[in-house]
């Protein structure tokens, strides 16, 4: 069923949209399972074990929704006939077509995290250092707004796939757009390159993030026992790209300059696109289907709305309403207003049963906690980058490692800890903590991670040991694994049947808001007096977690059987 009014988002199918992104999971049920095997369907087993990510932030959040088709796609060959994929074991025992999606996703994550690892310092480094000399606060705000825009674009990418082009075509087009964005950053001078490049990468990343996992789901029939391992292999590619990207682009940036680093990101995306182009015809016909085609008589109005939106944005930029220094605030406002509209539309709908309406109210405190969590977590790309540049002792046996290398720590911990969390949830079964408790624990631990900066505050340049940052990022990862995949899972369980996709959009809007706030908060960070910053934000996060913990019983009562 669909809402009475035309929905701006695709209606739910068993496999839509990917966390940002946590914004890559295994189920805590013994064997690894694709995240969306349970995410696309609101089943009777609403308190089933939660998902545990095996990917970087985006893999743990934004990549989670889309592959629900794994449970229903029914593996098909290129001609659309079922069953051939069940006998194809050429890629580590998996269908050969998986290699093509594995490759394009790995290289996309390589380019995405590689570019993001050097973006902030490129913006605020002086011209003599190869940067643009931008104010540090403005630069961090741009990075935060860009990250938020990626998650907003994920919603758009899912809609285009569901209503216009199908997942595979959107994936392919998005990869081209991403490559063009990295080329713009590497070739176009100054702020022109930044503006064009970041817009293209944000739009392309949202489209690819929303559909790659869904395409993987079409490679397997519902009964194929290889599906779980196939998704685990796919998410290994995500982590591999996220790990290698900052290492190699950062190394090239320190040796040859920023534009060489951006150029390497473009080369990586080009390699992924080339290998995918050769193999995309081998993908199942199911991957190219348009689940809910937009009626022909509605396409022109939709195009008109899109053009009007673009013209409005251009006018706002030209008139100075949207500026680099308030970009993060703009994305925060857009995300907040969108979320408010979604909540109002859903909660006032007559199509909701009393139980469904209660569950939506139960989602509200989880939504707010998610915003608070991502506001701190995503600062590893803003404040932590500045801290690593100014305060971290990056000397390794007399050689100074690039700033961006710090971004490669988190993917390693996710690979290691995801298996640990899966084992814990499997061992506990139904005795594991409820979702509100996990959310509160995530917020408290995230706040504690900020407090861990305090013993090293007040020092000069190179005063913080590298192992200290490694330890703090370990705590970041523990907090992420408690909230990111769990949040995506519970969102689908709480979603009313008539507004399933809109609820998923709300979860992504929480990530978009949090990521943008992470950029906005940087204006309060003072390198030489960082104690108040870490102290206040740390205690705010802990307070949010404690409040939710105290509200666990009433929240669970609103959730009506969903744990």
Where would I find each of the regions flagged by the language model?
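Intracellular loop-helix junctions on the cytosolic face of multi-pass helical membrane proteins
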Residues: 17, 25-27, 32, 37-94, ...
């Amino acid at each position: 069923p669909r809402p009475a009014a035309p929905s701006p988002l695709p209606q739910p199918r068993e496999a839509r949209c990917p966390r940002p992104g946590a914004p890559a999971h295994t189920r805590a049920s013994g064997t690894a399972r694709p995240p969306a095997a349970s995410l696309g369907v609101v089943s009777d087993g609403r308190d089933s074990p939660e998902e545990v990510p095996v990917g970087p932030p985006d893999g743990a959040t934004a990549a989670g929704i889309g592959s629900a088709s794994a449970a229903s796609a029914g593996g098909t060959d290129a001609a659309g006939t079922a069953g051939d994929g069940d006998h194809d074991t050429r890629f580590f025992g998996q269908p050969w077509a998986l290699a093509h999606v594995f490759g394009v996703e790995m290289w996309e994550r390589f380019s995405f995290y590689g570019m993001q690892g050097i973006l902030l310092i490129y913006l605020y480094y002086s011209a003599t250092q190869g940067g643009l000399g931008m104010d540090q606060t403005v630069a961090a705000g741009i990075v935060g707004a860009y990250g938020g825009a990626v998650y907003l674009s994920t919603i758009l990418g899912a809609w285009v796939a569901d209503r216009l082009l199908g997942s595979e075509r959107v994936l392919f087009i998005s990869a081209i757009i991403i490559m063009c964005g990295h080329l713009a950053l590497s070739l176009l001078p100054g702020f022109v390159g930044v503006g064009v490049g970041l817009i293209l990468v944000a739009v392309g990343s949202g489209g690819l993030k929303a559909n790659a996992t869904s395409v993987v789901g079409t490679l397997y029939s519902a009964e194929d026992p290889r599906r779980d391992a196939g998704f685990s292999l796919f998410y290994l590619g995500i982590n591999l790209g996220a790990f290698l990207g900052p290492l190699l682009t950062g190394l090239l940036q320190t040796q040859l300059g920023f534009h060489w680093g951006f150029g390497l990101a473009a080369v990586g995306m080009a390699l992924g696109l080339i290998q995918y182009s050769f193999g995309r015809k081998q993908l199942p016909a199911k991957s190219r289907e348009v689940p809910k085609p937009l009626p022909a008589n509605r396409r022109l109005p939709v195009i008109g709305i899109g053009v009007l939106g673009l013209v409005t944005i251009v006018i706002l930029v030209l008139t100075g309403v949207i500026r680099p220094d308030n970009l993060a605030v703009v994305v925060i406002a857009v995300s907040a207003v969108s979320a408010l509209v979604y909540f109002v539309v859903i909660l006032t709908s007559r199509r909701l049963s009393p139980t469904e309406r209660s569950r939506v109210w139960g989602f509200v405190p989880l939504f707010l906690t998610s915003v608070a969590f991502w506001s701190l977590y995503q600062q590893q790309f803003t404040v932590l980058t500045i801290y690593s540049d100014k305060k971290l002792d990056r000397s390794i046996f007399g050689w100074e490692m690039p700033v961006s290398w710090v971004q490669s720590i988190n993917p390693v911990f996710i690979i290691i800890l995801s298996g640990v969390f899966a084992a814990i949830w499997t061992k506990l079964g139904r005795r594991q903590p409820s979702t509100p408790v996990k959310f509160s624990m995530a917020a408290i631990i995230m706040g504690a991670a900020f407090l861990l900066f305090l013993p090293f505050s007040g020092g000069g340049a190179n005063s913080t040991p590298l192992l200290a940052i490694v330890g703090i990022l370990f705590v970041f990862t523990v907090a992420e694994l408690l909230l990111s995949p769990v949040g995506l899972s519970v969102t689908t369980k709480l979603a009313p049947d008539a507004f399933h996709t809109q609820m998923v959009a709300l979860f992504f809007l929480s990530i978009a808001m949090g990521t943008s706030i992470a950029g906005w908060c940087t204006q309060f960070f003072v390198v030489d007096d960082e104690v108040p910053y870490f102290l206040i934000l740390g205690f705010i996060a802990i307070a949010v977690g404690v409040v939710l913990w105290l509200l666990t019983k009433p929240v669970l009562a609103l959730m009506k059987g969903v744990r």
